[in-house]
Regions:
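Conserved N-terminal beta1-alpha1 strand-loop-helix module at the mouth
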Residues: 1-91, 168, 256-264
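A C-terminal functional module that forms or caps the active site or interfaces directly
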Residues: 193-242, 246
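Acidic (Asp/Glu)-rich catalytic clusters
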Residues: 11-12, 48-54, 80-85, 137-143, ...
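C-terminal functional extensions of proteins
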Residues: 221, 238-265
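Conserved anion-binding
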Residues: 13, 23, 94-192
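Conserved, mostly hydrophobic/aromatic
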Residues: 19, 58, 93, 122, ...
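Short, well-ordered coil/turn segments that N-cap beta-strands
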Residues: 13-17, 53-56, 86-88, 118-120, ...
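Active-site-adjacent beta->alpha loops and helix N-cap segments on the catalytic face
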Residues: 67-82, 99-105, 128-141, 198-206, ...
């Protein structure tokens, strides 16, 4: 099955929510664990243990594992394995972006079948040009994995750059969308885009997009499940809303309750 087919099956079975695994210090505190590798593993794997059957996908943020060095990366490997065993998809949030052999190296790290950190999909940055990401696109197609390219992110700092006008008159975000739409024709729809759910005006039109839309910003950043329709309009069926702190920030015992509160809000 292609990534797009696996994602569609997961959404049909479990709904379209993606749970972010962001074991930041405040979350470790809420769970009552130490700021060490053991605490990291308790939180990260505990999220999947409790919610593994209740979400289509999980998005571990690599930045919270990397400070612990090799031991933290080993925890991340186990978390990715847990997600797969739970029958959900893993979207590893690494936001990599480079050119040539360097981008090919990043692709091998996350998209090769035998990679220790192999994930169903990853996030990448197009700042060096969408074309610079082709090594990742090609390997993802060969291994039936997915890619989510940043276009209009949920943080307010990105607006000046991402809504800036290109020589064609389109915004930078729209330019990224248009390039991905064209590439998706030959890449089996595996190329997705990151569009923040926090914006009243995206500064781009995703209605003609032919891939998945990863939509961070639901919950703690202010967006709600109910507000997605007004943000994405005709593209709503493509949206994979992502929430993290709103769900995981109350400790293990509150995980399922907070998940339901988010979905009903």
């Amino acid at each position: 099955m292609t990534y797009r087919e696996r994602l569609a099956a997961a959404v049909a079975a479990r709904g379209n929510l993606c749970v972010g695994i962001d074991p930041m210090p405040s979350v470790l505190d809420a769970w009552g664990v130490a700021h060490d590798v053991r605490g990291l593993e308790t939180v990260a794997r505990g999220i999947v243990e409790e919610l593994g059957e209740h979400a289509a996908a999980f998005k571990p943020q690599s930045a919270f594992f990397e400070p612990f060095g090799a031991a933290g990366i080993a925890v991340l490997e186990r978390v990715l394995a847990d997600i797969g065993q739970a029958g959900a998809l893993s979207i590893l949030d690494v936001k990599r972006g480079d050119i040539g052999s360097s981008m090919a190296g990043y692709a091998q790290a996350y998209l090769a079948d035998d990679a220790p950190l192999a994930s169903d999909a990853i996030t990448v940055s197009p700042y060096l040009g969408v074309g610079s990401l082709l090594p990742a696109f090609e390997l993802a197609r060969a291994t039936s994995r997915g890619i989510y390219v940043l276009a209009r992110t949920s943080n307010p700092d990105g607006g000046h750059l991402q809504t800036a006008t290109t020589p064609s008159g389109a915004s930078v975000a729209q330019h990224v969308l248009d390039e991905l739409t064209a590439l998706n024709v030959e890449h089996d729809g595996l190329l997705g885009v990151v569009l923040g759910a926090t914006h009243k005006d995206l500064g781009c039109d995703p209605s003609g997009f032919n891939g998945s839309i990863l939509a961070p910003g639901v919950g703690a950043q202010g967006a709600t499940i109910a507000s997605l329709a007004s943000v994405f309009q005709r593209a709503l069926p493509l949206v994979l809303p992502t929430a993290s702190r709103q769900i995981i920030g109350g400790g293990r015992q509150r995980l399922r309750a907070r998940l339901q509160e988010l979905l009903s809000g």
